[in-house]
């Protein structure tokens, strides 16, 4: 029968399959398609057996089975695969039909596709989908953006299948063009930062001689307080996990992979001129971890400090680590929201920052109680320039900063790398410093490159000094350093 499906989904990897089953469970008829048609038959005969999911053996067949306006969702690898499918779909669709990209696409690609498809009368949505396989099946966080005219058409489906937090759907329209995928990219960057901070806390505790079970207990305590979050919870579970050979974690090779979204966030921060230092360090930490053979060799020839990791009051220091982790986490999110604010300004997106925090409250990897505090901050002050200036977070850092400084200082003394904890502290101190040494930096630039400088109290007026008496008096306009 033609025209019976509410939506089609292309891409039957685990995420795609689980999203289809989620939609089916919520009462929507889904048409499943995969480039390898045999996979469609296999899915219908196994995971989707007994459901209302239907299959298609070609894109033309798939489109014919959709109700109008047609809605087609792609869950395929970002890049050329998305463009290939769009190219094949365009001749089969009509004006007003919707194409949704639910993969990890670069936001610039999403903006480009929006512009191209708008000329053809087609609606395009780039939606972040977070929560992994379990989230896709039972309720992900969804971050749709693109052509806003598509939102009323997909809203009933998206808000039915997404996670809920305090009864509110973890899905709302984000903004035009690539806004949805940009917000998802920042989400993933923050995820990198959260994971790195937790790893540094683990490394310090391990260096202090705590066993896996003791560390698991500590993370369990933290998860019942202000650090309550999915990542803290799974860290506890990972530390407790045993197989036939004992604790598994210590046998896992210490080299971390990455799919690129953290790197995209760091690159975007540089492009927009926003100091998202913690996420950058989290990305570089993964790069450093990949140098396993070099690190093993260096460990035998490069000497560290003679001071061993030990404290007089372990209970207090473990509490210090908790506070350090919490304070650094605040900085990480503050930086992420700074990046979204600057991107929104340049791209003319109308982002709802409180709404974004709510979208991340459930279903996604960075879900935590902490996000409720961020939502409250932006709800009470929609134009808040930085989370650090919100009373709740300002007081939290005031309470925890002595512990934070103690942990970072001791880690340095003991030779334990804490790039995320320390760069967060440096950012905090830099942000609260009224006068930084950038005056010297600008003088240096003027000395060797005649780049000019402004004087205090004379902002907007640019001066150049002939520092040596032998150089010229003309300021530079091309050479930049």
Curated annotation (Swiss-Prot):
It comes from the Eukaryota. Keywords: Gluconate utilization, NADP, Oxidoreductase, Pentose shunt. The gene is Pgd. Catalyzes the oxidative decarboxylation of 6-phosphogluconate to ribulose 5-phosphate and CO(2), with concomitant reduction of NADP to NADPH. Its EC number is 1.1.1.44. It holds the Pfam family 6PGD. This is 6-phosphogluconate dehydrogenase, decarboxylating. One of its GO terms (molecular function) is NADP binding. One of its GO terms (biological process) is glucose homeostasis. The active site is at 184 (proton acceptor), 191 (proton donor). Substrate binds at residues 104, 130-132, 187-188, 192, 259, 286, 445, 451. Pathway: Carbohydrate degradation; pentose phosphate pathway; D-ribulose 5-phosphate from D-glucose 6-phosphate (oxidative stage): step 3/3. NADP(+) binds at residues 11-16, 34-36, 76-78, 104. Homodimer.
